[in-house]
């Protein structure tokens, strides 16, 4: 059972979470015409009266870009201002997840984006580990990732996540923790809601943006961090067979953080993961604002 934060932002005001309700006739419920973001907030280990938000500006920019797909003009700085106020009003002292959402709010039918009202809300919930930090087993899904020429995949468009939902349930019901999806070219592109990285021969490999992947903010941060750590990085298509003989592999995302892959189908991956661990440790230090070289990645929200 999720524990939701007490205050939400809904219809241009802050109000109790339980009072933020929409009609069953809301357009976005029927047509998937929405876009969402997701970011974590954690208490500052050095000062519990502060909340740390990782790469807030990037999250707000991506959501603002997603709004453009929906023909909605919502500036990134406005999203950021609302999220900061949302954090202050909730006064949370534990790790939590923020879900901002843009959607077509009209009541009625007919799939369209023109001449229709849009709105924006924010809510949150307490969140610990989304996936096991010790590692997950993955099934290669029978469902394929949509192609970018069919759907705008660079943002988190809500209707597109039916494929992720089908793949995740298929994986769990067949005894796995997570699903890996291939694109229409038969290349591994991402998990149900996370990007994927593979380590082979000391090189960090991940599918590029031309492989129908989400423009992951954690993914981008890992690539920058790996280069700064002197780890060779390559963005290229990833074959299914490569995963079976990978030295290491992991998933990345705001909710998942860095989650090792311990098994793909019936192929066990090595239990020693030096590159994964090195990046993971450094990323934790950055998100906790303990690395002065990356302080511009962390937005500090005072609760006082």
Model-assigned labels for residue ranges:
Residues 1-85, 103, 108-304:
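Helix-start/capping segments and mature chain N-termini
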Residues 95-102:
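ATP-grasp fold ATP-binding core
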